[in-house]
From Swiss-Prot:
The keyword Flavoprotein does not apply. HAMAP family: Ribosomal_uL24_B. This is Large ribosomal subunit protein uL24. The gene is rplX. CDD domains: KOW_RPL26. One of two assembly initiator proteins, it binds directly to the 5'-end of the 23S rRNA, where it nucleates assembly of the 50S subunit. Gene3D superfamilies: 2.30.30.30. GO terms for biological process: translation. InterPro entries: KOW, Rib_uL2_dom2, Ribosomal_uL24, Ribosomal_uL24_CS, Ribosomal_uL24_KOW, Translation_prot_SH3-like_sf. Pfam families: KOW, ribosomal_L24. Belongs to the universal ribosomal protein uL24 family. Part of the 50S ribosomal subunit. Keywords: Ribonucleoprotein, Ribosomal protein, RNA-binding, rRNA-binding.
Amino acid sequence: MTKTKPAPHRVKMHVKKGDTIQVISGKDKGKVGEVLRTIPSHSQVVVKGVNIRTKHVKPRQEGESGQISSYEAPIHSSKVMLYSTKEKIASRICYTVTDDGRKVRMLKKTGEIID
């Protein structure tokens, strides 16, 4: 019998859905895109226009033709950095507290507040 691997524990991620990021390693290095979905249990993110895979879909009904569809596959979150669209530069983040007491994410290189 084969055992299934238990899901790894949830890890806090530095990116959220809707963030603009830049890929820093791999075949899509340098590409900029928006985070469509995060998968914290595996520390992965799905980014628009990055890691495109093709899938061959069989016809479901008789007379219908098969298709080749493409989709974005997840990549590891350590391969991405947050990207400043104003300064056109990727940066690490730090957490700061604003004057009104909110904890926000800030880009280290530019000082730009993200959320």
